[in-house]
Amino acid sequence: MRRRALLQAAAAGAAGMVFGRTAAGSPGGVQAIRIDEPFHGAVHNRRHGKAVEGGLEVTVRGEAPPTAGVSVNGIPARRDGARFTAAVVLRQQETDITAVADGAAGRREDRIRVRWDRHSFPRYRFAIDDNSFFLRDIARKGYKSLFDCFYLKMLSDLHAKYGAKFVLNVYYRTDDGFELPQFPDRYRPEWRDNAHWLRLSFHALADKPDRPYQDAPVEKLSADFDKVAAEIRRFAGEETYAPTTVIHWGMVRPEPAVFAALAKRGVRALSGYFEMRDGRWDINYRLDDRRSEYLSHHDALVDFASGITFSKIDIVCNTVPLARIVHTLEPVLRDPNTAEIIDILTHEQYFWPFYVNYIPDHAQRLDAAIRYVTEKGYKPVFLHEGFLGAPE
């Protein structure tokens, strides 16, 4: 795409990663201008700048030809050789930042967009993946109350103790023939009465195959999503339904149509590991390397084209021994880039004694994680509400 076309697309918010990037630091010296910080799509809160009247002042850093005059959003930047810095005040939810270099090579510019989490506060969310066993258990045993099932009782106790909120990401079926249409709707009043802290959401059609949507067409993902969502609404009601924040295995086709289909269904946030495995970024919704690397050490990143914000999962309780739960969370809370939103995850199957990899102290791990963030002043939220659980 030619530079002018790229910048026009950027101005319309259509670019998925960066606005108008050109090469800097070529053999003859710096020949273009580049904004290094903030990152395009970055989410800024009070930890990333200075509160000023009506806004948040953040620092813009980058590189440009040493002899060029540089301005950022029309304000002259400070220069130090090839480097430049400038202060920009964020006053709207989204702000375009444009750096312009005027020099012997002509006029060059680079542009990014950032999101201001204006009403941010320290918060955590707790999601549980791979849910199906508890629904099968309730359906087959016909309990008088949902909370006669030990799994939901355990979550209810954590809510009573800490005010915790949970979203349970649900499969349509299990491998022994149970399917969501078999779950009765007679518990709808109880689901409704507990929807302020307990929600159900789409995860996948089934546990197997692994990575079911990594290469699946958008039609397959959409159909499975709608199938699960319809059943949740039927037996638990609209109040209990939540648009998903975790697709099974956190991998989808990296196509605009996929994210557009999810956004159309109310998806506002997607959580992943954004970690390197065998030399490749994984559990990252197949985002490009630059964004995956950024998300590996930041809370969140906005994809402006779809409107979806990606969130970094900070801990997976079933993979961390009880004695290491707090040690795992401590550095997350110390880093201003990861400390504002704590994204906690675990998986349902490890609670059940019949499961081959049953974890006897799984519930204690949840208690330890929730107790720690609660004692540190974090509030429970649903990630799909507002902006990552905070008011817009």
Map each language-model feature to its residues.
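N-terminal export signals
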Residues: 5-25
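Aromatic/hydrophobic beta-strand junction motif of beta-rich domains
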Residues: 58-64
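C-terminal domain-boundary segment and adjacent tail
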Residues: 269-274, 346-392
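Active-site-adjacent pocket scaffolds in enzyme catalytic domains
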Residues: 176-180, 239-240, 244, 249-346
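Surface-exposed, short loops/turns at beta-strand junctions within beta-sandwich domains
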Residues: 88-94
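Short, compositionally biased P/S/T/A/G/V-rich stretches that sit at domain boundaries
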Residues: 27-52
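Active-site beta->alpha N-cap acidic-glycine motif
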Residues: 112-193, 241, 344
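Metal-dependent polysaccharide deacetylase catalytic core of the NodB/CE4 family, i.e.
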Residues: 165-253, 276-282, 342-344, 348-352
